[in-house]
C-alpha cells in the first residue's frame, strides 16, 4: 500500500489515496500505522476518497482506531495532497467529513499549496448536542472537579466535542496525568478533546491539547477553533486570534455575522512510501 505522511504544524497523519488504494479495515490499519515503534508513526490515519456531495471525502481515524468526525490540521493536508498531486486544479475546494462539508481556500506558490484557509462552520454550544451532560443549556465557564482539583470549563463542538480550560501555566501542566481524566469524565458520553489554554493578550493564546483517542498532540485544528470561540465567550479575546500550539501557530477568526469559524494554517508533506500489510 502506498502512503503519504503529512503534518499540519506537527499534527501528523498517514494519508492514503483511496482513488488508487483499497483499505478493508481502516480501524485496524490506523492502529498499526500510527504506532511510532512498530508502524509508520502518526496521530492517526486519513483516507482520501471520492464524494457524491463535495469534491472529495476525508475519512479519519485516531491512533487507537476510533473514527473521528473532523480534523482541522488533517483537512488542510488533504487540500494540499489533492492539489499538489493533480487530483484537482481548483484553488477553492469542498471536502466532505462526518462533521459536514467544509470549504477551503488554497494559497499556491510555485505550483504547491503553502497555506490553507478553512471554513470550519458554526460552533455548537448546546450541551446535549456536543454532547455534555449538564444542568444548563450551555457550558460556559462552568466548574468541574478532576482528581481533587477545581477547574472551569467551556464546552464547544466543532463537529467533534471539546472542553476548553483556561489556566495560568500550561507549559508545566501535567497533561499526561490530567488529560485522560478529562477525556473519560462521566459527563462526556462520547469522551472529549480537552484544550488547556493560557491567555497571553486579547489577540494571542497559548494552547496544549489532549486529543480523544490520540493523547497529547502537537496541534489540533478543531481544538484551536473551539479555544478561540471559548476565549471570545469568556471575554478574553476578540477578532482574529493567533494561537500558539506545540507544533506552530494557527490563525482563527470567529465571524459573528455568519457565525462561522475560519482557520488558516500550513500543510506539509513529510515523506512518502510503500508498506507491506
Q: Where on the chain are the PLM-derived regions?
A:
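Generic structural detector for well-ordered beta-strands
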Residues: 105, 119, 131, 143-145, ...
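Membrane helix-loop-helix hairpins that form the core translocation module of multi-pass transporters
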Residues: 115-123
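Active-site-proximal beta-strand elements of phosphoester/diester hydrolases
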Residues: 117, 152-155
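Active-site glycine-rich loop that binds ribose-phosphate moieties when present
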Residues: 124-152
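A glycine-rich beta-to-alpha transition motif near the start of alpha/beta enzyme domains, typified by
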Residues: 1-112, 163-277
